[in-house]
Regions:
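Bacterial Sec-exported substrate-binding components of ABC uptake systems
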Residues: 10-54, 157-187
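Extracytoplasmic ligand-binding site segments that recognize negatively charged/polar headgroups
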Residues: 76, 116-120, 134-148, 182-206, ...
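Alpha-helical, coiled-coil/dimerization segments enriched in small aliphatic residues
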Residues: 198-224
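Structured C-terminal subdomain patch of bacterial secreted/periplasmic proteins
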Residues: 13, 146-153, 160, 164, ...
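Short helix-initiation/N-cap motifs at beta->coil->alpha
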Residues: 31-33, 87-99, 136, 220-229
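Short helices/loops that flank or line small-molecule/ion binding pockets
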Residues: 95-105, 125-126, 227-236
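A short, structured surface patch at a secondary-structure boundary
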Residues: 47-102, 108-113, 215
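Bacterial N-terminal signal peptides
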Residues: 1-9
């Protein structure tokens, strides 16, 4: 449904006067109103998660990424697998180590509201410019985030083009769904992240925009709250969304899915007979 998701927020760039170096510098206001000075148009950019890498590659060439996450190279989890196939070093699932940071010495770090505060403080204390985005947990927030990122990397016009294309695709999807006039269905996300998927998540916004009822919301559970087995049974969805098979199951998503579907209580539900596999990138990326 909407591959265009992650990207933009209102920020301003102010040219700084002075010597040659300062003439290249500019100030960006990030999602949390931090005024961040960027010494020059960055060439070695480090994102702190796969979603940020995806947004970055909407506005810069792959050569400007200083590193990428291992998950970026998995086509089942990432939209940018082909673009980052030659990028090194690769950041493991457990995050950015000091060794990697020192090795690549980025001239810009783009972090999110999910980044731990102690890491943000450390990076700033070492002199790295850190620009933060918020979430994103909604389409509107994604558009704001991409505008922040685009300004931070010195590509404001590219950011506006990405947002315009997102809006075009969303309108096209809305028009197609409206013409089909399908009866409402209720879907339940089967996920290891047992607190993910309710109202307040990107998944919920996209699902409901597609005209599908979210079973998590139907039983009163919000994003960040636990969905118990009792509530799963109570939700009585029309179908389950599950993780599709991948070549490797390093995250354990396939094992979790199989265990879930082997539960007798789940097998007695009508949704057990309508299991829809989705690549993880359509759920989490």
């Amino acid at each position: 449904l909407c591959i265009a998701l992650f990207l933009l927020s209102g920020c301003e760039m102010k040219k700084m006067g002075g010597d040659a170096a300062s003439k290249e510098s500019y100030v960006v206001t990030d999602a949390f109103d931090n005024q961040v000075t960027i010494p020059h148009k960055p060439k070695k950019i480090l994102g702190t998660d796969s979603a940020i890498d995806t947004m970055l590659l909407g506005v810069v060439e792959p050569s400007r990424l200083a590193a990428c996450f291992i998950a970026d190279k998995d086509p089942g989890m990432s939209y940018i697998a082909d673009e980052v196939k030659d990028i090194k070093p690769e950041i493991p699932l457990n995050g950015i180590s000091m060794e990697i940071l020192t090795k690549i010495s980025p001239d810009l770090i783009v972090a999110s509201s999910y980044t731990r505060q102690k890491e943000l403080d450390m990076w700033r204390s070492l002199g790295y410019p850190v620009v933060m985005i918020d979430g994103p947990t909604s389409i509107a927030q994604a558009e704001k985030d991409i505008r922040i990122i685009a300004a931070a990397v010195g590509e404001t016009e590219r950011g506006e083009k990405v947002v315009a294309e997102m809006e075009r695709q969303l309108k096209e999807v809305d028009s197609t769904l409206s013409a089909r006039n399908l009866p409402p269905q209720t879907g339940l996300l089967v996920s290891q992240m047992s607190r993910y998927g309710g109202p307040g998540s990107m998944y919920h916004e996209l699902l409901t925009r597609a005209g599908i009822k979210n079973a998590i919301a139907e039983v009163g559970v919000a994003n960040g709250q636990l969905l118990s087995q009792e509530l799963i049974v109570k939700s009585d969805p029309d179908f389950f969304f599950v993780s599709a098979d991948r070549e490797s199951d390093e995250t354990g998503a396939g094992k979790f899915r199989d265990s879930f579907l082997a539960n007798p209580a789940i097998q007695n539900m009508r949704a057990y007979h309508r299991v829809i596999p989705l690549e993880d990138r359509y759920i989490y990326a």
